[in-house]
Structure formats: C-alpha cells, structure tokens
Amino acid sequence: MSSFDTIAVLGGGAWGTALALTAARAGRSVTLWEHDAGNAQHLIEARESRFLPGVRLDDSIKVTQDLAEAARAQALLLVVPAQVLRSVATSLQPLIAARTPLIACAKGIEHGTHRFMTEIIAECAPNAVPAILSGPSFAADVARGLPTAVTIAATDADVAQALAQAMNSGSFRPYHSTDVRGVELGGATKNVMAIAAGIVAGRQLGASALAAMTTRGFVELVRFGKAYGARIETMHGLSGLGDLTMCCSTPQSRNFSFGMALGRGESIDTAAHGKLAEGYYTAPVLLEMAQAKGVEMPISTAVAAILDGRLGVDAAIEGLLTRPLKAEE
C-alpha cells in the first residue's frame, strides 16, 4: 500500500488551503490546484489565500493551474463544492493513474441525481478509488494548526488507513473507516440541521430551544442514516454527531450563519451574502430521499418549506411545536 507521499489539493479556497497546509505539516509533497487565474496568482505572489488572510502558505506547497500536473499526485483531495464535483471528477478521469484515491471534501448531495459524493466519483472517474473526508473542522482552525479530528473513509480498509496516516500531523488527527455512506451522509444532513439551528438562534428563541433542536436534529440524522445503510457508530462519531454539534453552535458555520440571518427576517438573497450555503441545495434533496424511504424528518421538512417560500419562519416553528406528542426515541 502506498504511503501517499505526494498529495494534490484541488481548490484554493479556505478549506483547500487549510488541507494543503495540513498535508505539508504531515510531511507530504503538496500541489495546490486553483482553477481561477486571479486566485492562483494571488496564492503564488502573496503566499496566502484571499479566503484565509493572515495565514501564510508553506513555502514547500506548489501552486498550479495545470490540472494534469496536479493529477500526477498519488492521492487527490477534491475540495470543490458538491454541485461542481461531477465536472472536476470527469476532467480527472483521463489524467489519473489507476487506483488513485480521489477524496471528496465537500459535504452535500448532488441536486437532481441524489448522488452522494463518492458515487459521483465512482461514476465519473472509474479508474479512481473514491474516498471521503468529513468531520467537525473549520478551515480557519485547521489552517492555524489548532487541534482537529476528522474521519477519512474508503471501502478499502487499507486505503482508508493509509490516507489517514498520510494526513496525520501533530494537530490534525484523522480516524479511518470503511463506512463511506455513513460518513458522507452525516456531513450532508448536518448542513440542513445547522440552518435550522441558526434560525433558532437568529429568532432569539433561547438556549433551551437550540439544545432541543440540535438533539432532535440528531434523531433525524440517525433515522435517515439507518434507512440508507449507515452504521450507528458512524452517526455517533465525528462525521455525524461531532459535525452536527459544531455546526449547530456557532456562526463560524456558513449554514448556521445563513439560518441566523433567516431567523432575523432577512431574505434568502440577503442572508446568502453572495454565496448560498450548501444546506440550501441539500434540503430539498434530503427531503425527497427521506420520503422515498418513508423516513419522518419534520425539522428537515420545515427548513425545506422555509427555503422554497411555502412557510414563514414563525409558521414553521409553530408547526414543529404543535405536532402530536410522542414517546422519545
């Protein structure tokens, strides 16, 4: 099994830059690919990302716009939005060596196809080994070397373990798993729950309401996970409960801050600040997938209704509070 001495990170945004720094700290030879010419030039000249001001890029990290050059690495971290992963994976297929791990670092479900990230990779880049990296991790924390733990999953246990070892550093601790579906499902589901938590905070409904929402949101995550074959220990782990807890508690989470703005009465366009949170795209897909399996997800239903304009925030909250009483699961 390869030790993955060379790693390419595709995407020079905040999270991509943070992971490139992490791989460099772990002793890997790192190439950072950025498709936008302006952003790439800034990375080269300023040695920092526009999205992480004040965090210097390690001198050993090579920045490139040449996808073929990046594709020569022994493992590639795909740090691109969930809704554009397909095009990137398709472009990589003719460039990568057989059995090259492509590790999705986005948390979402593809709109229109209901595909999870590793399913997209398997479909578009059959030469690759699909993997997923997820867990409670903010780019600013990781970039600055603050202690962080995540999960890396691949169906091949040896690959998952080798990838975890390759990214392991003094401050970044990856656990490995073969429950690919569970890991990516947790990350996608928490996006929607974080919007709900943000709405509660923005509406100033109090700490009790926020705790209740987060807890019942976790119940929905577990229900959905069971229906789609996730392991219970994964849902209770970093990529499930860990990520949910983090993103439902701080405006550092884009989904939470988006929800806060909605809770304060801002429009979706204003709340987005020019870039919609991933949970906006995940909510309707999550609901469709839950309905297909007969999974009850009232919080997700309420969020989807708010986002598509069928319900106002107050009506959605009232609807949740007036549901028939039931035994706690």
From Swiss-Prot:
Pfam families: NAD_Gly3P_dh_C (PF07479), NAD_Gly3P_dh_N (PF01210). Pathway: Membrane lipid metabolism; glycerophospholipid metabolism. The active site is at K190 (proton acceptor). Its EC number is 1.1.1.94. Keywords: Cytoplasm, Lipid biosynthesis, Lipid metabolism, NAD, NADP, Nucleotide-binding, Oxidoreductase, Phospholipid biosynthesis, Phospholipid metabolism. GO terms for molecular function: glycerol-3-phosphate dehydrogenase [NAD(P)+] activity; NAD binding. It comes from the Bacteria. It is an enzyme of class 1 (oxidoreductase). NADPH binds at W15, H35, K107, A139, R254, L276, E278. Coiled coil: none annotated. It catalyses: sn-glycerol 3-phosphate + NAD(+) = dihydroxyacetone phosphate + NADH + H(+); sn-glycerol 3-phosphate + NADP(+) = dihydroxyacetone phosphate + NADPH + H(+). One of its GO terms (cellular component) is cytosol. One of its GO terms (biological process) is glycerol-3-phosphate catabolic process. It is found in: Cytoplasm. InterPro entries: 6-PGluconate_DH-like_C_sf (IPR008927), 6PGD_dom2 (IPR013328), G3P_DH_NAD-dep (IPR006168), G3P_DH_NAD-dep_C (IPR006109), G3P_DH_NAD-dep_N (IPR011128), NAD(P)-bd_dom_sf (IPR036291). Sn-glycerol 3-phosphate binds at K107, G135, S137, K190, D243, S253, R254, N255. Catalyzes the reduction of the glycolytic intermediate dihydroxyacetone phosphate (DHAP) to sn-glycerol 3-phosphate (G3P), the key precursor for phospholipid synthesis. Belongs to the NAD-dependent glycerol-3-phosphate dehydrogenase family. PANTHER family: GLYCEROL-3-PHOSPHATE DEHYDROGENASE, GLYCEROL-3-PHOSPHATE DEHYDROGENASE [NAD(+)] 2, CHLOROPLASTIC. NCBIfam families: PRK00094.1-2, PRK00094.1-4. This is Glycerol-3-phosphate dehydrogenase [NAD(P)+].
